[in-house]
Every structure is written in C-alpha cells, then in structure tokens.
C-alpha cells in the first residue's frame, strides 16, 4: 500500500500522505507478473502494488482492503484496468472465501503490506493519530468497538495488557491506572485528550518518540485485531497460492515481523527440531514454502532518503511448494492474542 505504514513517528517524518509504495521494485521483482498471471494485492490502499502488477498487459489482480475509503478511491484504477482488477472490501480472514466466491484459480503471487496507512493517519476524523485532534475511533471498518470503547470500558488490568503486549509499552500499568482515574471524571472521546494524558503521565525526553506512540499502536491493533488478521491472511495465502507462487509480506514493527518470521520458519522447516528424533516422535509435515536469500529485505538508503516513512519496513518472502496447506500452529496464534493472564513484574 502506501509509504505510511509503521510507527507514527516514522510517519510524521514523511509529512502528509504521498502514496508511495514501499519496496515497490523489490515486491514487483518477486511477483514477476506475467501476461496470463493472477495476483493478490491483499492491502490495496492507494493501489500502488496493484498498479505495478497491472502494468503487465494481461495480468489480473484481486485486491482487497478492509477500509471502505480505499475501495471507493480505487474506482479510477478499476476503470483503467479494463476488467483486469477486481477490488473487494474484505479482511485478510475473508481472503480464501472471497477468492472461492469469485471462482478464481490459484494465485501466482500474494502481496501484503501490513498495518495502518499514511492516508488513514493523516485523516483526523479516523482517530488513528495523536498528531491531530479527532474522535478516538481507530476502526478500519466502521463496525465493532472503537478505541474509545476500549479506553472507557476495559478494566485496568485489561488495558495494561493491551498496552504492554500490543504496544510493547513498558509503562503500561502506569498509563492504564491513569486512564481509569481520569475516565472516572469524564470519558475519553478525543485523540488529543488521550495523547495529552499519556504525555503528562510519561513525559518523554527530547529526541524520543512521542510518549503516546506505543499506546496508540496498541489500541489500534486491539480495535482491528490486526495480529489475528495477519495470521489468518498468511494461512489464506498459503491455501490459495499455486506451487511456485510467491508470498511477499512487508511489515513495519516488531510484532508483525515476528509473526511473519515465525510463519516462514515453520512453513519452510527452518523452525523444526533436528533431523534425529526419538522412536515414536511424529514426523513434521512437509514444508509448504521454500525460503532463500538474505532476509529481511530492507529499503535502500536512497529509498529512505526519498521517503523517510519507509525506514522501518521489512520484507520477507517465500515460494510455495506443492505440500498441502495447514492451519496456523498454536505458536502463531499465541503471538496474535493477549495472554490469558497479565505478565508479572512490569
């Protein structure tokens, strides 16, 4: 999608949304679009990757995005594509069902660009950003609980867990306690009010990221179940890729990258136990992906200079084998969900 995926301080460095796809050349080189190929752009956004794929005459693209605004903005590219682009409002977890409903065959490549986009962050009314005053919303689709619902209704322990596990916020307990105390006087309704409270409780040092960065990331991930959707999307792509098809995933923070890294390690056999096994020990399933080359791929110095918002991007990729797809393991599901009990000592 666009250049603005990642932590919001990286996004602020780039200014207003410029709709520049991150690692575009590397992604398209991996996808290697062909005239008779079918490709998945799982995060349409401003259409940067889809446009690159469609530049190959005869290539067809299924693009999905859970943001209705992105779908509406894609009407022009649909018209330009002469029927080669199908754009659907859907989540990652809907991917396989959408492809099945449309009667599509297996994909030659599947491309993911994970996280919130610069367009979403730069629109104050969406409530994603601490840089603008807007409603405390953060929903990519206008359904389900908002960030305000979580902040005003969740108990202190649940809030601390969300901030700690989804934002890697060390001051999670302090911030959660302050939220509960302040909301007793008046509920939080705006991004500015929440950001100001966090800055008051955890004032940063000059040169540090904004004190609210990690908390806003955590709330956004919780509101949209971003990590659970990522796991579902990886599994859906595995099920719909043809042998030899490529899966390429760009992430912008450590939680996402950890899931993608673990997925490829487990699916390629790199995460399995040594070849010598005890009698009766189960044989691991055959690899569903082949992974090669130095990974992750990161933006060049020239790309970062031209587009500072790209600086935290990491690209991991693999080639689909003919082995049957399988359900995500418990290790992946555990990374995508909050632990049942809060971690102690934080």
Curated annotation (Swiss-Prot):
It is found in: Cytoplasm. GO terms for cellular component: cytoplasm. Pfam families: Methyltransf_5 (PF01795). Keywords: Cytoplasm, Methyltransferase, rRNA processing, S-adenosyl-L-methionine, Transferase. Residues 270-346 are annotated as: Disordered. It comes from the Bacteria. Residues 270-279 have a biased composition (Basic and acidic residues). Gene3D superfamilies: Putative methyltransferase TM0872, insert domain, Vaccinia Virus protein VP39. One of its GO terms (biological process) is rRNA base methylation. Signal peptide: none annotated. GO terms for molecular function: rRNA (cytosine-N4-)-methyltransferase activity. Its EC number is 2.1.1.199. Belongs to the methyltransferase superfamily. RsmH family. PANTHER family: 12S RRNA N4-METHYLCYTIDINE METHYLTRANSFERASE, S-ADENOSYL-METHYLTRANSFERASE MRAW. Specifically methylates the N4 position of cytidine in position 1402 (C1402) of 16S rRNA. This is Ribosomal RNA small subunit methyltransferase H. It comes from Methylocella silvestris (strain DSM 15510 / CIP 108128 / LMG 27833 / NCIMB 13906 / BL2). The lineage of its organism: Bacteria, Pseudomonadati, Pseudomonadota, Alphaproteobacteria, Hyphomicrobiales. The gene is rsmH.
């Amino acid at each position: 999608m666009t250049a603005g995926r990642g932590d919001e301080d990286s996004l602020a460095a780039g200014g207003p949304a410029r709709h520049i796809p991150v690692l575009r050349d590397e992604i398209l080189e991996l996808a290697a679009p062909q005239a008779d190929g079918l490709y998945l752009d799982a995060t349409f956004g401003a259409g940067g990757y889809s446009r690159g794929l469609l530049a190959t005459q005869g290539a067809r693209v299924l693009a999905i995005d859970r943001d209705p605004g992105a779908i509406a903005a894609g009407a022009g590219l649909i018209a330009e594509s002469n029927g080669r682009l199908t754009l659907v409002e859907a989540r990652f977890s809907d991917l396989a069902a959408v492809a099945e409903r449309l009667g599509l065959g297996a994909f030659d490549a599947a491309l993911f660009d994970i996280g919130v986009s610069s367009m979403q962050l730069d629109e104050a009314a969406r409530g994603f950003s601490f840089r603008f005053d807007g409603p405390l919303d953060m929903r990519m689709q206008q359904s389900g609980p908002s960030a305000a619902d979580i902040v005003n209704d969740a108990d202190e322990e649940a809030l601390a867990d969300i901030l700690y596990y989804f934002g890697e916020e060390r001051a999670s307990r302090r911030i959660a306690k302050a939220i509960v105390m302040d909301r007793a006087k008046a509920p939080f309704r705006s991004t500015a009010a929440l950001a100001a409270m966090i800055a008051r409780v955890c004032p940063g040092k000059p040169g540090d990221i904004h004190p609210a960065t990690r908390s806003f990331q955590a709330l956004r991930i919780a509101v949209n179940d971003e990590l659970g959707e990522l796991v579902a999307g990886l599994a859906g792509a595995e099920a719909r890729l043809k042998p030899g098809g490529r899966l390429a995933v760009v992430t912008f923070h450590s939680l996402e990258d950890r899931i993608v890294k673990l997925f490829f390690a487990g699916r390629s056999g790199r995460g399995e136990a040594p070849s010598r096994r005890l009698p009766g020990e189960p044989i691991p399933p055959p690899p569903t992906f082949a992974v090669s080359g130095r990974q992750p791929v990161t933006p060049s110095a020239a790309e970062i200079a031209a587009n500072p918002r790209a600086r935290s991007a990491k690209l991991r990729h693999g080639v689909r084998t003919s082995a049957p797809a399988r359900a995500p393991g418990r290790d992946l599901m555990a990374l995508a969900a909050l632990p049942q009990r809060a971690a102690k000592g934080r």
